[in-house]
């Protein structure tokens, strides 16, 4: 699979930049078969939720992580997902850029804002010079300022550029933004 790195170095570095505690409630949106949940479990995170539209992807990750880890696996489209809890950190590497319809983006951002009332977000999308399609689907591309503008209730702590190289050798530039929720005044 080409859509996630074998080692999620940038995401983990941003967890550190945000100072995410090991007992924080973390949701990985679109996590599917990615290795992030494996690394978080190995680093001692104990309150993890992985949401993905693909049950097959979730099963691959579940099989790797095993039953010992306390991970909630949720098969759902993030646009219709109605979580019944709050999270300290929302992580998304590569779902948001597939949302090319303004109404879909608004629904996604409304859910994010609702379920992260005091925490943080790590949002990663294709960079402005990234591909304009992925897996045959159109994508939106963002720079750090554009992502920050979409998150007015959050303050950017760190922004990074990362280049993912697919198994086929194709370079895909990403923009990562780590932002903390601003306290209401």
Feature locations, PLM:
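Class I (Rossmann-like) S-adenosyl-L-methionine-dependent methyltransferase catalytic domain
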Residues: 1-85, 99-185
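Conserved acidic residues
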Residues: 88
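A conserved beta-strand element that flanks and buttresses the S-adenosyl-L-methionine
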Residues: 91
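Short catalytic micro-motifs in class I SAM-dependent methyltransferases
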Residues: 94-98
